Amino acid sequence: MRLFEGAFQPWKLASTNLMQQCLLLNKKSQFHTTCILQGLKKQKANQRRKQNLKRREELRKQNLDTLADPIIGHSSEWIARLLKPYEILVERKKPNFPIRSIKFPASMETINLIVEKFEKIRASATEETKDFIKLNEVNEFPSSDTSLESNQDGFERLHPLAERLERMSQLSDLRKESIHRIFNIENSNSKTLRLNNKQLAVESFARNERDTGSPEVQAAVYTSRILALSDHCKNHKKDQTGKRMLRYYVHQRQRMLKYLRKVNFDRYVHCIKNLGLTDELVLREVTQ
């Protein structure tokens, strides 16, 4: 055994290395820093993300007055007169909904004329009823000094006449109320509101009485459709057909405005001012 005391003993080296590796494994199993480091990285990333979103919102609010949406544009007096179907359909469920008249299929002046005609018809019908019941028989009754209750025959003759006249008056009032309800915005659907906006566009931008095809009128009609579809798509994000139609209307409006800009620049400036657009918005609202 003394022969191997100073010699190389590999089995001792192997056992020593094995013991050292076991000690290192035990130390590593006791101290884990990977989860802590990853948690700090995620926390810093979330902080940077929140700061970026906050900064983006601040920039959006700062540019809200200077930069407008290339599709919707700025608010104008004509746009404020348009009826927005989605907002009206939501607001009319409230108890204090304002009563407003519509222009399509008839204006309020036409409705008043219809009501006046009903009043004339009622008056003429009342006169005919009086003649039919032979009111001349009433003149045969005793004078006013004599009480009507003392003459039962006269009371029986006047009572049916009073009932008929009262029924005719109630019927006329119901007809008048029905006409106003039919043409009230509260009982209108979205299609009627869109047609009302179309009629308003023709009245506001027509160059003459029968002008329905000028670029100004067509651009105004497209603008009313764009605003209505934009509100619809914001509340119905899965409506792909509505989004395609919105994109189509935007392209058609830009086409009309570019043509008007080429033909008559003064008319173009007046038109886009009423529509709430600018020259820059028209040129960059469609980039492809």
Swiss-Prot record:
Keyword Transit peptide: yes
A Pfam family per the record: Ribosomal_S15
Main location: mitochondrion
A GO term from the CC aspect: mitochondrial small ribosomal subunit
Keyword vocabulary terms for this entry: Mitochondrion, Ribonucleoprotein, Ribosomal protein, RNA-binding, rRNA-binding, Transit peptide
CDD domains according to UniProt: Ribosomal_S15p_S13e
Transit peptide residues according to the UniProt entry: 1-50
Role this protein plays: Component of the mitochondrial ribosome (mitoribosome), a dedicated translation machinery responsible for the synthesis of mitochondrial genome-encoded proteins, including at least some of the essential transmembrane subunits of the mitochondrial respiratory chain. The mitoribosomes are attached to the mitochondrial inner membrane and translation products are cotranslationally integrated into the membrane.
Subunit structure: Component of the mitochondrial small ribosomal subunit (mt-SSU). Mature yeast 74S mitochondrial ribosomes consist of a small (37S) and a large (54S) subunit. The 37S small subunit contains a 15S ribosomal RNA (15S mt-rRNA) and at least 32 different proteins. The 54S large subunit contains a 21S rRNA (21S mt-rRNA) and at least 45 different proteins.
Record-given protein name: Small ribosomal subunit protein uS15m
